[in-house]
């Protein structure tokens, strides 16, 4: 019977109880027996009531994670299953499905003798998920581009109705309605893809916690490294890098440099993506503040990648490269078809949105109407009385139909009709007077 003593830090001023792990070579399972010895603890009645129980539980939990890591490292030959805590929460079913697909891809690549099967399975799964969410990404980019193309119109409305927020909101809403743009359409696809990526992240975390990411990938010593379960749970995920031990990192210079290459590539890819997709420079102070924050965002992501398994960093790097390629295709190469073009062609000018429902009047229409009326007048003057009456009645009927179709021209048409009738009457009186003056021919 072999026993391994694991030392622990002081606990409430006294050492923690002795912990012994027993292993029987004749058994295939691994047992952990904890022996408590209270001979070093003070009497119970002398313990103060202000003991920090939360601190006790936190240290005990950290100790259990340390024991889990020590058990795996002490006896690698005994392939025991480490019980990982799979707390998927609301996205547990998504993470379980992603984990199943990842294992299927890994087994499929291993069956065809592909080296680094787990690393390539992570890359392949990221590509599949990215391709599946491409329609949502395309919809989000199209909505974003349409909103950007409408910004000049929106600014014109704000300048025209400065100080009247209610009118600005009304005109802006009408502008969105006419352009067929929904301001919230750009957010919905992004919100729909968030559970997918959270599930994929949790699936990779579960695989790492289960100890399945033990194989390397290209120059990376292990996809599960460089951190450990205990370091991640205690919040000291970069303890493998700092502090130095005897003047060198804990893992040695070679492995440490190998693990640092991928976070550096991740940071570089983030900056390249930001430079490619950088919006045009403006004098807007809000945009300048946003760009300033984005400059430090890749550094934060790179720092966070130091405290997670390398398998997750591979997923982040692959996802970032694919996202950049998608954005270039959608924005630069014409893959996205926004509802509003770059010049906002066909959209009304600021302050005229209230006329969008009415049909615009054709240019020169009123001039043509006046010319037709003038021709009618000349024709009536040139015709005899017998032909004037039916023409006048026809013109009156036409004028009446026009009045019914267009209320705005009612007064004009009635006045024109009255003028025509007066001219006809005067013309007929003149003809009668001339006939009466004629003498009969002998």
Swiss-Prot record:
Which GO cellular component terms, listed alphabetically, does the Swiss-Prot or TrEMBL entry include? chloroplast thylakoid membrane
Q: What is the effect of changing residue 150 to P?
A: In strain: cv. Alaska
- Tissue expression profile of the protein: Highly expressed in apical buds. Low levels of expression in leaves. Not expressed in roots, and stems.
* UniProt-recorded Gene Ontology molecular function terms: membrane insertase activity
**InterPro entries hit by this protein:** YidC/ALB3/OXA1/COX18, YidC/Oxa/ALB_C, YidC_ALB_C
Topological domains on the Stromal side lie at 130-183, 318-442
Biased composition, Polar residues: where in the chain?
Answer: 414-427
What residues form the membrane-spanning segments? 109-129, 184-204, 297-317
Q: Which residues lie on this side of the membrane: Lumenal?
A: 1-108, 205-296
Task: Region Disordered: list its residue ranges.
Answer: 350-371, 390-442
Question: Which one GO biological process term can you cite for this protein?
Answer: protein localization to chloroplast
Q: Which residues form the signal peptide?
A: none
Query: Which Pfam families does the record cross-reference, listed alphabetically?
Result: 60KD_IMP (PF02096)
Basic residues biased stretches: 431-442
Q: Spans of biased composition, class Basic and acidic residues?
A: 358-371
Q: Name the domain of life this protein comes from.
A: Eukaryota
| Effect ascribed to mutating residue 127 to G | In strain: cv. Alaska
Subcellular localization, as worded in the UniProt entry: Plastid, Chloroplast thylakoid membrane
Classify the protein's membrane topology as the record does: Multi-pass membrane protein
Question: What are the protein's UniProt keywords?
Answer: Chloroplast, Membrane, Plastid, Thylakoid, Transit peptide, Transmembrane, Transmembrane helix
Induction per the UniProt record: By the plant hormone gibberellin A3. Expression is induced to a greater extent by short day conditions than long day conditions.
Q: What does this protein do?
A: May be required for the insertion of some integral membrane proteins into the chloroplast thylakoid membrane. May play a role in inhibiting senescence.
What is the similarity comment for this entry? Belongs to the OXA1/ALB3/YidC (TC 2.A.9.2) family.
Q: What is this protein called?
A: Inner membrane protein PPF-1, chloroplastic
């Amino acid at each position: 019977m072999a026993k391994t003593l694991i030392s622990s830090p002081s606990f409430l001023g006294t050492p923690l109880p002795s912990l012994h792990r027993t292993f029987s070579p004749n058994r295939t399972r691994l047992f952990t027996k904890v022996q408590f010895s209270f001979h070093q603890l003070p009497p119970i009645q002398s313990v103060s009531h202000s003991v920090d129980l939360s601190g006790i539980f936190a240290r005990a939990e950290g100790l259990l994670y340390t024991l889990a890591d020590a058990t795996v490292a002490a006896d690698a030959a005994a392939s025991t299953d480490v019980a990982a805590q799979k707390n998927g929460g609301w996205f547990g079913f998504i993470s379980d499905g992603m984990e199943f697909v990842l294992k299927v891809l890994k087994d499929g690549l291993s069956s065809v003798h592909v080296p680094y099967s787990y690393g390539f399975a992570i890359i392949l799964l990221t590509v599949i998920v990215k391709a599946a969410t491409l329609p949502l990404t395309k919809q989000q980019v199209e909505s974003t581009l349409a909103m950007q193309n409408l910004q000049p119109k929106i600014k014109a409305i704000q300048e025209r109705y400065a100080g009247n927020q209610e009118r600005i909101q009304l005109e802006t809403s009408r502008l969105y309605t006419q352009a067929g743009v929904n301001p919230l359409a750009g957010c919905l696809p992004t919100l729909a893809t968030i559970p997918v990526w959270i599930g994929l992240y949790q699936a990779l975390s579960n695989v790492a916690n289960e100890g399945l990411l033990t194989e390397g990938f290209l120059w990376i010593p292990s996809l599960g490294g460089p951190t450990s379960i205990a370091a991640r749970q205690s919040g000291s995920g970069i303890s493998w890098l700092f502090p130095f031990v005897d003047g060198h990192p804990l893992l040695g210079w070679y492995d440490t440099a190998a693990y640092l290459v991928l976070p550096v590539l991740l940071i570089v890819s983030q900056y390249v993506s930001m430079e490619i997709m950088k919006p045009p420079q403006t004098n807007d102070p809000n945009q300048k503040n946003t760009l300033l924050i984005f400059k430090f965002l890749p550094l934060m992501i790179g720092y966070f990648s130091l405290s997670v398994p390398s398998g997750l960093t591979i997923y982040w790097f692959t996802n970032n490269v694919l996202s950049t390629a998608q954005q270039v295709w959608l924005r630069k190469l014409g893959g996205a078809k926004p509802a509003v073009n770059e010049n906002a062609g066909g959209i009304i000018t600021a302050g005229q949105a209230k006329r969008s429902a009415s049909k615009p009047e054709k240019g020169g229409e009123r001039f043509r109407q006046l010319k037709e009326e003038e021709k009618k007048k000349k024709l009536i003057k040139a015709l005899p009385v017998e032909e004037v009456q039916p023409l006048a009645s026809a013109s009156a009927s036409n004028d009446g139909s026009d009045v019914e179709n267009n209320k705005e021209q009612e007064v004009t048409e009635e006045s024109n009709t009255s003028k025509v009738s007066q001219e006809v009457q005067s013309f007929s009186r003149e003809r009668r007077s001339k006939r009466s003056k004629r003498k009969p021919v002998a």
